[in-house]
């Protein structure tokens, strides 16, 4: 969503040596580990259209991957996203599902989604993914355009009706725009896959820029790659407006930028007293407190309210409608403290949350990650405090430190405000 005029001027830029990108064969989608499967319940957390969920089930996916958990909730809201994650972690599904979710196919003869990549093979593969996930959306039209084929064929395709989704390589897409065959004036989603491959090569980068300038200002921009060097990140961000940045180094590591993580050793019966003390001394915008059961969620939210900490609870015992209603109240800042079971740990995002408490230790390192990721959303500051009350809690905390290569230290007597509050 960046202003087109703010793009870097690459004409004066010193051309760095770039090696020609080989037409690598894109990884096959049936390789184990690709998309780390999707359980329909996991994807239901993202509140996707029933037609999309049905296609997901048909594909046999079970659990959303780390990348999907982090990106999809923001992507479906139209947020700009810059994401780096290794191949086979389900990056493609992020933008395919997010754009299909936002698509309103009643707008015929209008291209709403443009996805570009650097090779013909990858373009073809992405178009096939769109076809798979839009299986139960019969009005959605997808087309793929790339070099090496007669351009007249592409022009005929466009003449018979503009597709809602266009996938292709920059050279061919630009040729179709220059020939006035492809109109992107109403485009809503601009996606680059393997973005560094396109933006590192000066000629391809200029093509991408020219295409970008032919699209509206208020569109969503998403960029994905397996490798994003520190040098190329600012170039990507020139196309974007306050993007959510997600960097997954490998399947085990998700870097949480700006998040301070601490633990407190205490007995089970000391948890409430410690929690109230910390809520008194810490400065927070909004807080999420995670507990392990519905009963504890109900009891703690009531206790907090009695102690003049107005809280709202969300747990798996509620109907979907009630959960969403309470989630919206919290999101609208009607309450500043939320008590939740793991149900809330995945796929929901509140930008004002800057402190997360693990009142009860999560059952595994994955759950820990999804819980603490609610605070300090990528690039913002946040604080995660975990209560450790027995040997099993300590064991899980050690697993978290080993798996994610982080050092979680004991909570100090005083915490510098600037480490967990923006602008301090």
Swiss-Prot record:
The organism of origin for this protein: Drosophila melanogaster (Fruit fly)
UniProt-annotated location(s): Nucleus speckle
Protein name: ATP-dependent RNA helicase WM6
Domain Helicase ATP-binding: 72-246
Protein family: Belongs to the DEAD box helicase family. DECD subfamily.
Catalytic class of the enzyme: hydrolase
Organismal lineage: Eukaryota, Metazoa, Ecdysozoa, Arthropoda, Hexapoda
EC number: 3.6.4.13
InterPro entries found in the cross-reference section: DEAD/DEAH_box_helicase_dom (IPR011545), Helicase_ATP-bd (IPR014001), Helicase_C-like (IPR001650), P-loop_NTPase (IPR027417), RNA_helicase_DEAD_Q_motif (IPR014014)
Motif (DECD box): 193-196
One GO cellular component term noted in the UniProt record for this chain: nucleus
Biased composition (Acidic residues): 1-16
């Amino acid at each position: 969503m960046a202003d087109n005029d703010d793009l870097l001027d690459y004409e004066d830029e010193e051309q760095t040596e770039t090696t020609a990108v080989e037409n690598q064969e894109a990884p096959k989608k049936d390789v184990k580990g690709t998309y780390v499967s999707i359980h329909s319940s996991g994807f239901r957390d993202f509140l996707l259209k029933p037609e999309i969920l049905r296609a997901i089930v048909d594909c046999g996916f079970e659990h959303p991957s780390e990348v999907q958990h982090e990106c999809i909730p923001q992507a479906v809201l139209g947020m700009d996203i810059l994401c780096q994650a290794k191949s086979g972690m389900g990056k493609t599904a992020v933008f395919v599902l997010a754009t299909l979710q936002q698509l309103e196919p009643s707008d015929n003869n209008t291209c709403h989604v443009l996805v570009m990549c650097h090779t013909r093979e990858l373009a073809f593969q992405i178009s096939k993914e769109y076809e798979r996930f839009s299986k139960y959306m019969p009005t959605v039209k997808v087309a793929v355009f790339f070099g090496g084929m007669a351009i007249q064929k592409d022009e005929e395709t466009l003449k018979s009706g503009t597709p809602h989704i266009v996938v292709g390589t920059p050279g061919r897409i630009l040729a179709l725009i220059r020939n006035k065959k492809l109109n992107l004036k109403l485009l809503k989603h601009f996606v680059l896959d393997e973005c560094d491959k396109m933006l590192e090569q000066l000629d391809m980068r200029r093509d991408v820029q020219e295409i970008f300038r032919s699209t509206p200002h208020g569109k969503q921009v998403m960029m994905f790659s397996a490798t994003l060097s520190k040098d190329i990140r600012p170039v990507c961000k020139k196309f974007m407006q306050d993007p959510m940045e997600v960097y997954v180094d490998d399947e085990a590591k998700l870097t949480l930028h700006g998040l301070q993580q601490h633990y407190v050793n205490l007995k089970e019966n000391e948890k409430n007293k410690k929690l109230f003390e910390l809520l008194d001394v810490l400065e927070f915008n909004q807080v999420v407190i995670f507990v392990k059961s519905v009963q504890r969620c109900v009891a703690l939210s009531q206790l907090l309210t009695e102690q003049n900490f107005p809280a709202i609870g969300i747990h798996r015992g509620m109907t979907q409608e009630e959960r969403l209603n309470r989630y919206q109240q919290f999101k609208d800042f009607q309450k500043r403290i939320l008590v939740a079971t793991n149900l809330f740990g995945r796929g929901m995002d509140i930008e004002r949350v800057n402190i997360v408490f693990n009142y009860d230790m999560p059952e595994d390192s994955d759950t820990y990650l999804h819980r603490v990721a609610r605070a300090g959303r990528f690039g913002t500051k946040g604080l995660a405090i975990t209560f450790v009350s027995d040997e099993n809690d300590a064991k899980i905390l050690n697993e978290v430190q080993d798996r994610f290569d982080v050092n979680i230290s004991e909570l100090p007597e005083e915490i510098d405000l600037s480490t967990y509050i923006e602008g301090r």
